[in-house]
């Protein structure tokens, strides 16, 4: 379980790296393609779309498959961004990479929380934030070391390396018990939970998931959104949204 959570958290390195690597590459991309502000805008547009799609995708195909899609997307789109021959293709790849980032923002914390034992869940969830910061630092360091060479393609393409390593590691992981329970596959959920929790906590953990799923709000998307901002949690949610800006 710890291996699974650490593997997922490692995707934060790629996410953090993408945040900072464009700072070094920006002036050289502008020189070659004549674009500047659109570079970051394209990524942000993709991130918004990815963040919206992340939850439905994880529920539809599973947490593990979603993680594989994210890691593969990071790898492929980072490489295609680095080798783009034109501004149009470059921006298209930035949008697709942004979608991948948006997906990861939604899916990775869920995958970690559902794959970790209750006693270690908080610490392992924090690991994702730590790896994001590590990625940001690496982005600046790599950009600084390659800056004199004008090799912006290398600066952007290096992001594929950690993503590919995580992709290989994810193959060894399992689906989460919560997703199996969501799909009504309780026997598989029990087997998955037995790999995470000690024997005496397996059934209580499954009962907790069962109760959580039974209390999920039903109805339309707009109805669920209204419920999110109803009652005592509205102020906290508004604060979190404003903090993001």
Question: Which positions does each model-derived feature cover?
Answer:
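Transmembrane-helix signature of 12-pass secondary carriers
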Residues: 1-245
């Amino acid at each position: 379980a710890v291996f699974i959570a650490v593997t997922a958290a490692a995707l934060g390195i790629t996410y953090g790296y993408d945040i900072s690597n464009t700072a070094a590459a920006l002036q050289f991309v502008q020189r070659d393609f004549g674009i500047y502000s659109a570079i970051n805008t394209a990524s942000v547009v993709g991130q918004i779309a990815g963040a919206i799609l992340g939850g439905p995708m994880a529920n539809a195909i599973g947490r593990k498959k979603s993680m594989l899609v994210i890691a593969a997307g990071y790898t492929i789109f980072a490489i295609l961004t680095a080798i783009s021959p034109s501004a149009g293709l470059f921006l298209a790849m930035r949008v697709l990479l942004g979608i991948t980032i948006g997906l990861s923002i939604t899916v990775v914390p869920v995958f970690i929380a559902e794959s970790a034992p209750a006693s270690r869940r908080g610490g392992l969830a924090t690991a994702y934030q730590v790896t994001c910061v590590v990625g940001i630092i690496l982005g600046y360091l790599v950009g600084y070391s390659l800056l004199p060479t004008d090799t912006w393609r290398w600066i952007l393409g290096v992001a594929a390396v950690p993503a590919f390593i995580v992709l290989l590691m994810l193959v060894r992981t399992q689906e989460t018990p919560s997703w199996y329970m969501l799909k009504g596959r309780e026997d598989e959920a029990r087997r998955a939970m037995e790999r995470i929790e000690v024997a005496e906590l397996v059934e209580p953990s499954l009962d907790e998931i069962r109760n959580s799923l039974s209390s999920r709000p039903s109805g339309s998307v707009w109805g669920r959104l209204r419920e999110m901002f109803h009652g005592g949690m509205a102020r906290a949610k508004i604060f979190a949204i404003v903090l993001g800006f």
